[in-house]
């Protein structure tokens, strides 16, 4: 699922349909199971799927979303104004995602700009970071100023 789609879901999802599963200071994580999500493809076909989301709140306001993709992976989106505040790390520390979704054991990252954040998340969750060596090789080729 793209960041644009996750942003749209986050804007429109009703957090009252979920349950608070974790609170850390002024942060809350709300789990919403079996949320009906409609996607329309480029050719106009409509696809309906049911997903599990973890909504991240800061001071009661939606800050981010974590999508559980079947038993394979997770996707994370945080609104730009909430980035670099360690919201995901604080709410998911101590292997919380691994406890919440024990069938998930890895995370992938294809975005060089987010690599270090995703690697940190993988480490605190006990996940394997897929394609880590490929990304590290690409980073090594970037000239330092």
Language-model segments: which ranges?
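A short, internal acetyl-CoA/4′-phosphopantetheine-binding micro-motif in the GNAT/acyltransferase core
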Residues: 73-87
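Conserved acetyl-CoA-binding loop-helix of GNAT-fold acetyltransferases
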Residues: 84-100
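Conserved beta-strand-loop-alpha-helix junction that forms the acyl-donor binding cleft
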Residues: 106-123, 127-128
């Amino acid at each position: 699922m793209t960041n644009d789609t996750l942003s749209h879901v986050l804007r429109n999802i009703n957090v009252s349909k979920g349950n608070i599963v974790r609170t850390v200071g002024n942060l809350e994580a709300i789990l919403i199971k079996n949320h009906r999500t409609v996607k329309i493809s480029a050719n106009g076909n409509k696809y309906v799927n049911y997903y599990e989301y973890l909504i991240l709140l800061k001071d009661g306001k939606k800050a981010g979303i974590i999508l559980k993709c079947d038993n394979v992976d997770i996707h994370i989106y945080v609104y730009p104004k909430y980035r670099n505040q360690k919201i995901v790390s604080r709410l998911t520390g101590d292997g919380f995602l691994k406890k919440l979704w024990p069938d998930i054991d890895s995370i992938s990252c294809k975005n060089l700009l987010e690599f270090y954040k995703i690697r940190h998340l993988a480490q605190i969750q006990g996940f394997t970071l897929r394609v880590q060596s490929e990304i590290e090789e690409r980073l090594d080729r970037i000239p330092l100023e």
